[in-house]
Amino acid sequence: MDVRQSIHSEHAKTLDTQALRREFLIENIFVADEYTMVYSHIDRIIVGGIMPVSHPVEIGGEVGKQLGVSRLLDRRELGVINIGGAGAIIVDGQRHDIGHRDALYISKGAKELVFVSNEASRPAKFYYNCAPAHTAYPTKKVSPADVAPVTLGDNLTSNRRTINKYFVPDVLETCQLSMGLTELAPGNLWNTMPCHTHERRMEVYLYFNMEEDSCVFHMMGQPQETRHIVMRNEQAVISPSWSIHSGVGTKAYTFIWGMVGENQVFDDMDHVAVQDLR
């Protein structure tokens, strides 16, 4: 388990490129036949990926020992979105078939967590966010057909994108975790611009659907002290509450956003005018 400490905004603005990447970038999300796990002190979110290839991958009691409990979800809830081939997640003996871009919310208290791919040649890629939970809401599958896509932006400003809200109060109940998937239209490059911060939530982005020769310049920092991190395909970045989180790519891309905090109202954000950015 890779543990990332919280960092003050005054400290963050003094960091060079390598230090920024070390603090906020998660480079290796998917490793064959393993799970990856990054634990952030910021709202205690856990971020990672699971890619079963030659055999199923189980998250067992070894993780619980690192968290001071018996199992990962003794005091946590889990959200998973599959960005790879078809697969399944077995939760306490019940199999949930999870296809490409299907998602599964897994309840606090679940013990057995096994992840499998249907085909080794096209393995599932289960990306997950895990957050502290105070009560148990039912495990539930969410497919793209269950969400109401919202298209925002304009081709003229290169920010036309479709937002798919998977884990939000209108779709299912969670303790604090929200997740969704935003896809840029072909030829569009900007996400979340004009940008914002949200004092009551932190956020993590996973960028994917990127070609090998492309990248995203992820914008972060306080609005008057902006910095950037160069992102490649299937990499994630941690965004503290005080930081903007926006990006511009060399080509169109898709990203998953996950939020943890005290407020699940999607529009609870502090907008930043473009002319106020520095």
Swiss-Prot record:
Signal peptide: none
First-tier enzyme category under EC: isomerase
A matching Pfam family: KduI
GO biological process assignments: D-galacturonate catabolic process; D-glucuronate catabolic process; pectin catabolic process
Pathways involved: Glycan metabolism; pectin degradation; 2-dehydro-3-deoxy-D-gluconate from pectin: step 4/5
Alphabetic keyword roster: Isomerase, Metal-binding, Zinc
SUPFAM superfamilies assigned: RmlC-like cupins
Cofactor note: Binds 1 zinc ion per subunit.
Annotated residues for binding of Zn(2+): 196, 198, 203, 245
GO molecular function: 4-deoxy-L-threo-5-hexosulose-uronate ketol-isomerase activity; zinc ion binding
Reactions it catalyzes: 5-dehydro-4-deoxy-D-glucuronate = 3-deoxy-D-glycero-2,5-hexodiulosonate
Entry cofactors: Zn(2+)
Listed InterPro entries: KduI, KduI/IolB_isomerase, KduI_N, RmlC-like_jellyroll, RmlC_Cupin_sf
E.C. number: 5.3.1.17
PANTHER family membership: 4-DEOXY-L-THREO-5-HEXOSULOSE-URONATE KETOL-ISOMERASE (PTHR38461:SF1)
Sequence similarity: Belongs to the KduI family.
Cited function: Catalyzes the isomerization of 5-dehydro-4-deoxy-D-glucuronate to 3-deoxy-D-glycero-2,5-hexodiulosonate.
Descriptive protein name: 4-deoxy-L-threo-5-hexosulose-uronate ketol-isomerase
